[in-house]
From Swiss-Prot:
Family: Belongs to the RimM family.
High-level lineage: Bacteria, Bacillati, Bacillota, Bacilli, Lactobacillales
Disulfide links within the chain: none
Keywords (A to Z) from UniProt: Chaperone, Cytoplasm, Ribosome biogenesis, rRNA processing
Subcellular compartments: Cytoplasm
Organism in which the protein naturally occurs: Streptococcus pyogenes serotype M1
PRC barrel domain: residues covered: 96-168
Residue ranges crossing the lipid bilayer per the database entry: none
Name this protein carries in UniProt: Ribosome maturation factor RimM
The keyword Cytoplasm appears for this protein: yes
Amino acid sequence: MEYFNVGKIVNTQGLQGEMRVLSVSDFAEERFKKGSQLALFDDKDRFVQEVTIVSHRKQKHFDIIKFKDMYHINAIEKYKGYTLKVSKDNQGDLQEGEFYYHQIIGMAVYEKDVLIGHVKEILQPGANDVWIVKRQGKRDLLLPYIPPVVLNVDVPNKRVDVELMEGLDDED
């Protein structure tokens, strides 16, 4: 079965079995809602077990979650550093114009039909996502996912068309 990363357990939260998760999910509210099924993978990326979310809340930059049948810190402490993943079957349907992060990673980025590089990572620093584009012979480009910059995302052809605003590329 194919799985996709949605978060990393970075610490425990209190004594009642809550965990602090650093989300890398494109739809965190949906992904961590009560009843969601996720898979737990250890630090060597080996499947450990399926888990069910029983509670979720946001706190600063973290998602605080609790799993079914794990109601004490002693039951969850061993999972620090583990990765949470969603199976392909549990991803859910997308609306037109929406896509999953894993579909964007690796896409070729073009400006006026000139290849700039490939998306290697997606950050969620605040109001909008930032795509990190790996370029040949240059530093990585931080590309804000906003309409004036990202013009078209063609998932089937793995292509992104952009128009770099002045000041975005500090190496030009």
